[in-house]
């Protein structure tokens, strides 16, 4: 049951964070449970933190889906899962040439980070070599930072990706540990944490976030932010469930735009120095309040996602310019 809370001084809480005072879990929950009428005040406070560490810069990232569908995992949210009946394109690995071409498209879209993503539980050594070949050519011909998201890794694979010049590895926690078995049965929450740690141990910057709106409680939503703090994720993608028809979660109620804003603000308060990225579901869930999200977040994807469409890059550039913000190109 939602408790009645006295109104907090959100700006004071923000200045405490800037002075390197960690907020309590109760404060994070209070942000999520605040009245909707307080959301602009909360976002204003979140911007104090965001501006202190990142100024007016916005980082752009672009995804390429190098292998679509055909995944043996049963993640309930995912249209690429073996149990999904969603009508998506399914294809095996793109050629190295296509992956490299995507990097140059990322530059045209003013992205600084290029994310090479493949469906599946884990890559084979042959598949890792395929990615490494493309990564080396991209590193030789561009200044892009490269992120990979290929599934579970072993130590040797993580080390070889690092040696090839991969800057960042994405492996999301997805949801709270207590909620994980409701979302997936083919692997565990701890499996995901293990891969994040392997990437970090190999010298790759860890990228890990969550998909909000998958049945987690408000308290669990806050605890996810603290867990991401604990594993020291450098980049935190905040995804909002898009209840895709044909997936087990197709009937799940999606978060409202205001709920999404509260999540972004809460994540900024808990992880003040980290890259907070508005990721999957941005256009669908935040809708007309997308620009407000950038008062907490400092990063977005530009273009399409894995199996859902994003808005035109020109719309994102215009949104950033209209806010008085600046695109940070070719920066991790």
Curated annotation (Swiss-Prot):
Residues where [2Fe-2S] cluster binds: 115, 147, 207, 277
InterPro entries per record: Aldolase_TIM, BATS_dom, Biotin_synth/BioAB, Biotin_synthase, Elp3/MiaA/NifB-like_rSAM, rSAM
One record GO biological process: biotin biosynthetic process
UniProtKB keywords: 2Fe-2S, 4Fe-4S, Biotin biosynthesis, Iron, Iron-sulfur, Metal-binding, S-adenosyl-L-methionine, Transferase
EC identifiers of the protein: 2.8.1.6
Cofactor(s) essential for the protein: [4Fe-4S] cluster; [2Fe-2S] cluster
Binding site for [4Fe-4S] cluster: 71, 75, 78
Radical SAM core domain segment(s): 53-282
Enzyme class per UniProt: transferase
Cofactor note: Binds 1 [4Fe-4S] cluster. The cluster is coordinated with 3 cysteines and an exchangeable S-adenosyl-L-methionine. Binds 1 [2Fe-2S] cluster. The cluster is coordinated with 3 cysteines and 1 arginine.
GO molecular function: 2 iron, 2 sulfur cluster binding; 4 iron, 4 sulfur cluster binding; biotin synthase activity; iron ion binding
Gene3D superfamilies: Aldolase class I (3.20.20.70)
Pathway: Cofactor biosynthesis; biotin biosynthesis; biotin from 7,8-diaminononanoate: step 2/2
Catalytic activity: (4R,5S)-dethiobiotin + (sulfur carrier)-SH + 2 reduced [2Fe-2S]-[ferredoxin] + 2 S-adenosyl-L-methionine = (sulfur carrier)-H + biotin + 2 5'-deoxyadenosine + 2 L-methionine + 2 oxidized [2Fe-2S]-[ferredoxin]
Source organism superkingdom: Bacteria
Regions annotated as coiled coil: none
Assembly information from the UniProt record: Homodimer.
HAMAP family associated with the record: BioB
Function: Catalyzes the conversion of dethiobiotin (DTB) to biotin by the insertion of a sulfur atom into dethiobiotin via a radical-based mechanism.
Family from the record: Belongs to the radical SAM superfamily. Biotin synthase family.
PANTHER family from the UniProt entry: BIOTIN SYNTHASE, BIOTIN SYNTHASE, MITOCHONDRIAL
Name this polypeptide is given: Biotin synthase
Species of provenance: Bacillus thuringiensis (strain Al Hakam)
């Amino acid at each position: 049951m939602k408790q009645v809370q006295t109104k907090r001084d959100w700006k004071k809480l923000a200045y405490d964070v800037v002075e390197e005072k960690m907020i309590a879990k109760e404060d994070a929950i209070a942000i999520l449970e605040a009245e909707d009428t307080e959301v602009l005040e909360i976002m204003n406070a979140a911007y104090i933190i965001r501006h202190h560490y990142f100024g007016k810069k916005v980082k752009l990232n672009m995804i390429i889906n190098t292998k679509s569908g055909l995944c043996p995992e049963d993640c309930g949210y995912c249209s690429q899962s073996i149990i999904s009946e969603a009508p998506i394109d399914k294809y095996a690995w793109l050629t190295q040439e296509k992956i490299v071409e995507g990097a140059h498209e990322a530059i045209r879209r003013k992205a600084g980070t290029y994310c090479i993503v493949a469906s599946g539980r884990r890559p084979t050594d042959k598949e890792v070599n395929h990615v490494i070949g493309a990564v080396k050519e991209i590193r030789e011909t561009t200044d892009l930072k490269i992120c990979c998201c290929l599934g579970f890794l072993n130590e040797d694979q993580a080390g070889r990706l690092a040696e090839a010049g991969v800057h960042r590895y994405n492996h999301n926690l997805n949801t709270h540990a207590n909620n994980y078995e409701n979302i997936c049965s083919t692997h565990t929450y701890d499996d995901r944490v293990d891969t994040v740690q392997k990437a970090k141990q190999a010298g790759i910057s860890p990228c890990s976030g969550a998909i909000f709106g998958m049945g987690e409680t408000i308290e669990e939503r806050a605890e996810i932010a603290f867990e991401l703090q604990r594993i020291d994720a450098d980049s935190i993608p905040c995804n909002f469930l898009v209840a895709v028809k044909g997936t087990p979660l197709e009937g799940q109620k999606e978060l409202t735009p205001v709920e999404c804003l509260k999540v972004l603000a809460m994540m900024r308060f808990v992880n003040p120095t980290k890259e907070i990225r508005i990721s999957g579901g941005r256009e669908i869930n935040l809708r007309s309040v997308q620009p407000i999200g950038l008062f907490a977040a400092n990063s977005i994807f530009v273009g399409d996602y894995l199996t859902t469409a994003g808005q035109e890059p020109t719309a994102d550039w215009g949104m950033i310019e209209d806010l008085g913000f600046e695109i940070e190109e070719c920066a991790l």
